[in-house]
Amino acid sequence: GQPCSARWRSEWGAPPPARVTIADDSMTADAAHRLACEGTALLWRGDFQNARQLLNAMARRADRHPPKPGTSPAESFHFHRQTQSRRARILGMLLVPLEEDYEIPLRRAPDLRLACTEAYGPGEGQALVSLRELLGLVGAHEWRKNGVVVPALGDRIHPHYGVFSPIRSEYVDLVADAPLPSNALAFDIGTGTGVLAAVLARRGVSHIVATDQDPRALACARENLARLELTDRV
């Protein structure tokens, strides 16, 4: 084989693997799990659906080692986080290639170009990404397309990739039901999808200032508030 290179993609800042080996449909789950535990990434060249099955098998093997009990709640939490981090690192070792337009050059691979573009922006050459992250893009794309029902809003919010989704209603209900000291002005710091700003606007607050330091969150909030026709208040 000839040497080749590709851009490394990791939305969560995982470092590129130091060692990479080619893997295909002939690789067993035990061998894949062992290599991943040793720090060797597996660049998949086989069938895409078989890669998904292999990832599930690797996850089952990783879950055979639960965190050890701690002598205190803090220590137990630390061990739990340690185990979860190790699990994520192992499962992140199964890699798939992406073409410049985000096409996946594998047999039976789905068309995930739109999901990748929504998360990564325009393509910048060939790349490698963990299959686990790629499957996360699929879930995020479905949320963005279909939206999440927010009962307190009586409508849907469409979260973008990397923006916290309002799937838990407790904090939204709290803002929807809490007495307001004034209807003149409110601030939504860390607006995310814009869901709380939208709830406050629907409650009659005249002017809401919504802020966030993440450009993707700001774009998401603007899109949601425009869809809900609340941009005159927020």
Residue positions per predicted region:
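N-terminal auxiliary segments of SAM/dcSAM-dependent transferases
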Residues: 1-2, 6, 10-13, 17-148
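Proteins with a high burden of low-complexity, intrinsically disordered sequence enriched in S/T/G/P/A and R
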Residues: 1-19, 50, 86, 159, ...
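Proline-rich intrinsically disordered, low-complexity coils
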Residues: 15-17, 66, 151, 159, ...
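Hydrophobic transmembrane alpha-helix bundles
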Residues: 95, 143, 157, 223-227
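Class I SAM-dependent transferase core
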Residues: 132-180
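Conserved SAM/SAH cofactor-binding pocket of Class I
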Residues: 168-234
